[in-house]
Amino acid sequence: MTGTGKTVTRVDLCEAVYQKVGLSRTESSAFVELVLKEITDCLEKGETVKLSSFGSFMVRQKGQRIGRNPKTGTEVPISPRRVMVFKPSAILKQRINGQANGSMSNSDQAETD
């Protein structure tokens, strides 16, 4: 990984909204919290949240399966559960990989179909 290692927090997002949109700090914080709550509420209901040019958050159901304790080797049942997954858009993948817009490889195009 060649990232900077910085973790962006809610406070960082609120500050970015404050700096770039021009809302007060209180309004910026309320705005960020509202957006995050709406995304959370949708996911909790099992809805997919698709953000154009960014990606999709979705909830998937995982069935029961047998796992193994790595220390003892004992089989352990893993209960069925719901997990949240994020699938980045092709545009986000390109930006992360430093590619210019519109220069998708064949493998990237196959993933978006």
UniProtKB/Swiss-Prot annotation:
One of its GO terms (biological process) is regulation of translation. Pfam families: Bac_DNA_binding. GO terms for molecular function: DNA binding; structural constituent of chromatin. CDD domains: IHF_A (cd13835). The keyword DNA-binding applies. GO terms for cellular component: cytosol. Keywords: DNA recombination, DNA-binding, Transcription, Transcription regulation, Translation regulation. It comes from the Bacteria. Signal peptide: none annotated. This protein is one of the two subunits of integration host factor, a specific DNA-binding protein that functions in genetic recombination as well as in transcriptional and translational control. Belongs to the bacterial histone-like protein family. NCBIfam families: himA, PRK00285.1. Heterodimer of an alpha and a beta chain. This is Integration host factor subunit alpha. The lineage of its organism: Bacteria, Pseudomonadati, Pseudomonadota, Alphaproteobacteria, Hyphomicrobiales.
